Amino acid sequence: MASRFMTDPHAMRDMAGRFEVHAQTVEDEARRMWASAQNISGAGWSGQAEATSLDTMTQMNQAFRNIVNMLHGVRDGLVRDANNYEQQEQASQQILSS
């Protein structure tokens, strides 16, 4: 399976689609978490407690953003590699047929 995956552009693109779905899920959950934290923050928290909560949420949001960027990087790499593999495969077939 793993060796076929590395030489199957369709499987690579399918996997890229899965990474996109994962990235979207992480983004959606981070958005929900941020909205929930905003509701808590507006519910009577003030001063140092509110600032600490906001700082923590900002750090967590950045961590989720990093995860999304990493997932998108893998997705983009898989699509790029699938395209390169197909181009090389076509070039090889042309050379062999001439």
From Swiss-Prot:
UniProt key word Secreted: yes
Keyword Lipid metabolism part of the UniProt annotation: no
Keyword field: Secreted
Lineage: superkingdom: Bacteria
Matching SUPFAM superfamilies: EsxAB dimer-like
InterPro entries in alphabetical order: ESAT-6-like_sf, T7SS_ESAT-6-like
Broad class of where this protein is predominantly found: secreted
GO terms for cellular component: extracellular region
Protein localization: Secreted
Record family assignment: Belongs to the WXG100 family. CFP-10 subfamily.
Name by which UniProt lists this protein: ESAT-6-like protein EsxM
UniProt organism field: Mycobacterium bovis (strain ATCC BAA-935 / AF2122/97)
